[in-house]
């Protein structure tokens, strides 16, 4: 394969990842199949970087003319519109299943139900409120830090979520599941590129903030995996969405705490 063909292949995989995780239209020449979607996992972090960057731009463009709370809300709205609430939906389904089911089978069945339950509604409301409040506090501390936090959190949280695919068992047997192709064998190249995207955005941060966030994310990933194993024996697409949302919120927490210390 020539260098040009290799670059074309990587761009193609990035666009597949973008089409899977966002509502951004893909070019007509991009063809999606299970094999491409499987390999596209390497670029999930970069998709997060794109979503975070666009959200941050909206925040930076509006924060001089609008109250911090409104600018943050607009930035969050952009993120939701870009992804179609994909991860938020996973968070709600996961909490409905984990909160309402007694056995792993019950939990998986509830998670597949499209109706929103009380556990899911509470989780969704609290998650959105936490994100808004934490970002407002970061904006009042320093607007540049708040915008950078959006970029970092959207990227790192997706790296944490996608990395679960590489070590854990996919527990749904449904062949029609959108997440099924992701559950197939993942290569070392996918993992290394995924991790590299997370390391890349840490350059936005000062040394202590970057190190603190890295250590917390490693610990959080381990905790999430332990919970998923105990609840359903592995992961599903919904739980990956929940992992992303939780990791994003924790990112804001860490950056706010470290920012107040520095």
Curated annotation (Swiss-Prot):
Pathway(s) annotated for this protein in UniProt: Cofactor biosynthesis; adenosylcobalamin biosynthesis; adenosylcobalamin from cob(II)yrinate a,c-diamide: step 7/7
Function: Joins adenosylcobinamide-GDP and alpha-ribazole to generate adenosylcobalamin (Ado-cobalamin). Also synthesizes adenosylcobalamin 5'-phosphate from adenosylcobinamide-GDP and alpha-ribazole 5'-phosphate.
EC number(s) recorded for this UniProt protein: 2.7.8.26
Protein name according to UniProt: Adenosylcobinamide-GDP ribazoletransferase
Membrane topology summary: Multi-pass membrane protein
GO molecular-function terms, A-Z: adenosylcobinamide-GDP ribazoletransferase activity; cobalamin 5'-phosphate synthase activity
Family: Belongs to the CobS family.
Catalysed transformations (reactions): alpha-ribazole + adenosylcob(III)inamide-GDP = adenosylcob(III)alamin + GMP + H(+); alpha-ribazole 5'-phosphate + adenosylcob(III)inamide-GDP = adenosylcob(III)alamin 5'-phosphate + GMP + H(+)
Taxonomy, superkingdom: Bacteria
GO biological process terms held by the UniProt record: cobalamin biosynthetic process
Main location: membrane
Keywords: Cell inner membrane, Cell membrane, Cobalamin biosynthesis, Magnesium, Membrane, Transferase, Transmembrane, Transmembrane helix
EC top class named in words: transferase
Cofactor: Mg(2+)
GO terms under cellular component: plasma membrane
Organism: Shewanella baltica (strain OS185)
């Amino acid at each position: 394969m020539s260098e040009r063909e290799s670059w074309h292949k990587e761009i193609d995989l990035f666009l597949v990842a973008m089409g899977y995780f966002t509502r951004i239209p893909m070019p007509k020449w991009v063809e999606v199949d299970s094999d491409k979607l499987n390999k596209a996992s390497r670029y999930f972090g970069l998709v997060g970087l794109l979503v975070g960057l666009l959200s941050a731009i909206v925040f930076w463009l509006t924060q001089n003319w609008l109250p911090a709370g409104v600018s943050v809300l607009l930035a969050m709205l952009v993120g939701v519109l870009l992804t179609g609430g994909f991860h938020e939906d996973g968070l709600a389904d996961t909490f409905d299943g984990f909160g309402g089911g007694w056995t792993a089978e019950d939990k998986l069945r509830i998670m597949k139900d499209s109706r929103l339950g009380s556990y899911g509604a509470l989780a969704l409301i609290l998650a959105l409120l936490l994100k808004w409040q934490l970002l407002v506090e970061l904006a009042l501390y320093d607007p540049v830090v708040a915008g950078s936090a959006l970029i970092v959190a959207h990227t790192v949280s997706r790296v944490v979520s996608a990395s679960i695919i590489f070590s854990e068992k996919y527990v749904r047997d449904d062949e029609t599941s959108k997440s099924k192709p992701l559950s197939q064998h993942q290569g070392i190249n996918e993992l290394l590129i995924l991790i590299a995207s997370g390391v890349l955005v840490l350059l936005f941060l000062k040394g202590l903030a970057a190190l603190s966030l890295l250590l917390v994310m490693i610990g959080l990933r381990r905790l999430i995996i332990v919970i998923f194993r105990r609840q359903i024996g592995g992961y599903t697409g919904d739980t990956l969405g929940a992992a992303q949302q939780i990791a994003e919120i924790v990112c804001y927490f860490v950056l706010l705490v470290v920012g107040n210390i520095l």
